[in-house]
UniProtKB/Swiss-Prot annotation:
Homohexameric ring arranged as a trimer of dimers. InterPro entries: ExoRNase_PH_dom1, ExoRNase_PH_dom2, ExoRNase_PH_dom2_sf, PNPase/RNase_PH_dom_sf, Ribosomal_Su5_D2-typ_SF, RNase_PH, RNase_PH_bac-type, RNase_PH_CS. Its EC number is 2.7.7.56. It holds the Pfam family RNase_PH. One of its GO terms (biological process) is tRNA processing. SUPFAM superfamilies: Ribonuclease PH domain 2-like, Ribosomal protein S5 domain 2-like. Belongs to the RNase PH family. This is Ribonuclease PH. One of its GO terms (molecular function) is 3'-5'-RNA exonuclease activity. The gene is rph. It catalyses: tRNA(n+1) + phosphate = tRNA(n) + a ribonucleoside 5'-diphosphate. The keyword Cell membrane does not apply.
Length: 237
């Protein structure tokens, strides 16, 4: 039995609320159960120096957690003077995931920065961030389209992410913190709307996992991502 009493293939309650920030070109408040992330997408008429003059744009991401997003206060990274390795890893993952489904040529010579700020963390902050980031980016591109700023279709597909793991010997979908902290194996899957794999991160926490167990986790992830993609489409409809 899962601590949340969910079925093995059951997502937490997921919501994707578009257009929640007044000033941002795109935004989304994403909730995976008790994990809540505020995502904004900001259009900037500038590019990294190494991209100038190439006729294409860029999508990048930043990620952070509020001090009391966790059970005990976490010191702000700005106060520490540097980002920790986990933060850097996650924001690079978010940026990579979004760029796989964006036509950077169609975007033109401009940059969209996606900021993911974790308001409350209960497991799966990176997967919630990626899923909400797609909605915020779509919201930003819709804003640009109404102003005739785009050459063509920028978004090629959806992209979403979900965690899976082996908990008490059973493959389960969408781990919360209670499960994640006790799981024998946990993995994050980033996939496109048509089911292609963008990235897989998997770790055996206690004992190695078999190929069959990995395939069982991937099957759960495919089911979960398909549901998330449906919710994304509803959010931007």
């Amino acid at each position: 039995m899962r601590p949340s009493r969910r079925a093995p293939d059951e997502l937490r309650a997921v919501s994707l609320e578009r257009g929640v920030v007044k000033y941002a070109e795109g935004s989304c408040l994403v909730k995976f159960g008790d994990t809540h992330v505020l995502v904004t997408a900001t259009l900037e008429e500038r590019l990294p120096p190494w991209l100038k003059g190439q006729g294409r744009g860029w999508v990048t991401a930043e990620y952070g957690m509020l001090p009391r997003a966790t059970l005990e206060r976490t010191r702000r990274e700005a106060a520490a003077g540097k980002q920790n390795g986990r933060t850097v890893e996650i924001q690079r993952l978010i940026g990579r995931s979004l760029r796989t489904i964006v036509d950077l040529q169609a975007l033109g010579e401009r940059q969209i920065t996606v900021d993911c700020d974790v308001l409350q963390a209960d497991g799966g902050t990176r997967t919630a961030s990626i899923t909400g980031a797609w909605v915020a980016l779509a919201d930003c591109l819709a804003w640009m389209k109404t102003r005739n700023m785009l050459k063509g279709q920028v978004m090629r597909d959806n992209v979403a992410a979900i965690s899976c793991g082996i908990y008490n010997g059973t493959p389960v979908l969408d781990l919360d913190y209670a499960e994640d902290s006790e799981a024998e194996t946990d993995a994050n899957f980033v996939m496109t709307g048509d089911g292609r794999i963008v990235e897989v991160q998997g770790t055996a926490e206690k004992t190695p996992f078999s190929q069959d167990e990995f395939l069982a986790l991937m099957a759960l992830a495919q089911k979960g991502v398909a549901r998330l993609v449906d919710l994304q489409k509803m959010a931007v409809a």
